[in-house]
Amino acid sequence: MITDCHIHISPLEMFKPQALELMKKKRPNFEQIAEFCRSPKAFLKYLDVCGIDRAVLINYVAPEVIGFTNGVNQFIADYVKEDPKRLLSCGSLHPRHTTNVLADMEQILRLGIRMIKIHPP
């Protein structure tokens, strides 16, 4: 079984405008990436073409840099519902952007997120 352990599938609507523009400039295949971010089915087909069985989808809270709030956790929880055996969710908690770490962790668990990335302070 082949598992890609580091894929960023992100909510495009959360990107700060300047971060999104930079991504568009630096990624010649931006439209393909955007389609994968919008459509789990399209991303699963791409995994099939590449011979990848599963993918860990990593998001992270980074409001200052990219614009991502803790809403990325809900986004990825919803995204992986398309095929939870192949799409493995990795949520995020940023110590500087929470007032209650325990409550945020409990919410991540309620969403069914299977892994967590703790962004450094």
Task: Give names to the regions the model predicted.
Residues M1-Y60:
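An N-terminally biased module of ancient metal coordination in phosphate/nucleic-acid-related enzymes
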Residues D53-R54, A62-P121:
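Active-site gating/metal-coordination segments in enzymes
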